[in-house]
Amino acid sequence: SSHITEVRLCHIKRDDEGIVQWDTEGSDSKLTITGDVFIDASESGRLTRLSNFGGTVGRYDWPANKLDSDERGSSGKARQQAASLMFKVTGIDTSATEPDPKNNALTRTVFGDKDSNGVWSGDGGIYAYKNNSKIINFNNTYGPRGFALKPFNMAQDGPGSGEWWVNMLLVFNVDGRAYNRDLTGDTKNHFPKDMRSDYKTVDDAWVKAREVIDSSDFQEAIQEFPGFRNATVVKENGMPVVGNTLYLRETIHSALSSSARANDTENSNYALRATDFLEAGTTDNRNYAKRMGLNAYWIDVNAYKFEDLKPNGAYEWPVTKFVRSDVTIPDLSPTYVPYSAIATNFVLNLLIPGYATGVASLGWAAARTIPNQCVLGDAAGVAAAYAANNNVDPLNFGSADITAIQNILKNSGALLEK
């Protein structure tokens, strides 16, 4: 195992084309940080990947018969779940209803103050996504280009605001490890050497997605969703207001053994296996003694490519049961998260509560939500402080160390029991 001694940071800036570049101007533009313990809570898994990575990309660990031919075998390059670019709208009708997706004869409300915190949220659009001709035409046209509208979830931009942030646009074929600023210069060795030829960098995908959001086709199509009839995309300086970053859903996964990396290893080469989520309450009990918390979310696999939205020729949502028809997706059941999921066998002093955590790809479809990442983050923060205070590397924790960390978490209000 290797040992991280320092990380080097540099400012970034977005250029006029929308591409994020290194910003080396000024005496304070670069910073070197030394430390005893390092934590990678990133989406890209950059520190994990650059230090000493023994894991896999995307869904590489799936059964080979659930992968495309170019994802299989030792030279296979696996796909990553679709990304999204959030955008802002105004003109939402919060009284909108829609046919219930489980029974079209019934109606359901789309918007409400669901947390009673003064901020409204909304989710819906499955019926329109499946049946509305304008939405279908948009997806048929833009899907092959790597973009598609999906049923939405959205939130008001603060109490009483007329503006909303919307998660509705899928962006396919994005390599969450790949950034334009690593194409040249001092960091060119950091660009992934195994990027798929049909994939885009995060930066190029962000720029293209913003262009799609700025199109009249997009504006007309979103108005077909319930509550969106009079909605318009909010603009600033002539361009749509969008998220500063792409919402990535998957990048890399830390494995237990680098030599065992292969297709069909989702139940053997990860601290948290697929079955720990598929059969929670049984197989995950082996992790009870070293648990750091609970993962509580359903297995929510988004599309890996546009074709996943139309498994049998018609648009479907959600797509989990189609892309993984070989397994039975359970109802929500909490899963014990072991300490080994955030430690890595390849670096003595690195903790990974971010996307690169030691979870098989199918399990990551449940672990990828922010509340579950907060559970990992709480554990990593406590473990890092404990390691520094006790002068021990996180990878070398014994059972007494694990128990001590569990007690700190419990005393802080963390849930460690089902």
Regions found by a protein language model. Give the residues of each.
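N-terminal cofactor/phosphate-binding cores enriched in small/glycine residues
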Residues: 1
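Flavin (FAD/FMN)-binding glycine-rich loop and adjacent Rossmann-like elements that form
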Residues: 6, 13-37, 41-378, 383-416
